[in-house]
Amino acid sequence: MPKPTKGPRLGGSSSHQKALLANLATSLFEHGRIKTTEPKARALRPYAEKLITHAKKGALHNRREVLKKIRDKDVVHVLFEEIGPFFADRNGGYTRIIKVEPRKGDNSPMAVIELVREKTVTSEADRARRVKASKKAPEAAAAAPQAAVEPEAAEAAPAPDAPEAAPEAEAAAPRPADEAEGSSED
């Protein structure tokens, strides 16, 4: 059962408010973001989010329910074919309201309402964590054999502070085959 809205109506009458919200929602779905007054943005947010929830379901009944409110068939098509599937894995919070500077003429508070197009922060954080872990895994695997070799080398070689130790270490180090052949030819 429809319940009356508390407080004053946007535009004066309830029919004007319905038309106003339908037009704002049409513009929002068409352009992705709109700049409007803050009270209109706050009234539009739940209205638009309910329409997106209908679009996520995607059934014919839901499409007809949305067509009762938004008369532009092209916008409804975009809503059901692009916007709804984009938010399929998101439970609410499809829009964002950002306050901007007041309007110059009458100093009324303005806001930008937009569709949240980027994925959630948690999914980005999970992806970043997986990438970081995948980078560490090969490095750790490569570092493990080197770590086993390094203690042996540290025990065999004297402290690197001694200058005479460096030539001995170079002499003890195996030379590549090309250098070995070149020195035997001399």
UniProtKB/Swiss-Prot annotation:
Example GO molecular function: structural constituent of ribosome
Listed Low complexity bias regions: 139-175
Keywords, ordered alphabetically: Ribonucleoprotein, Ribosomal protein
GO cellular component, one term: cytosolic large ribosomal subunit
InterPro entries: Ribosomal_bL17 (IPR000456), Ribosomal_bL17_CS (IPR047859), Ribosomal_bL17_sf (IPR036373)
GO biological process: translation
Annotated TM spans: none
Ribonucleoprotein among keywords: yes
PROSITE patterns registered for this protein in UniProt: RIBOSOMAL_L17
One Pfam family, short name: Ribosomal_L17
Start and end residues of each stretch annotated as Disordered: 123-186
Oligomeric and partner information: Part of the 50S ribosomal subunit. Contacts protein L32.
Family: Belongs to the bacterial ribosomal protein bL17 family.
Protein name (database record): Large ribosomal subunit protein bL17
Gene it is expressed from: rplQ
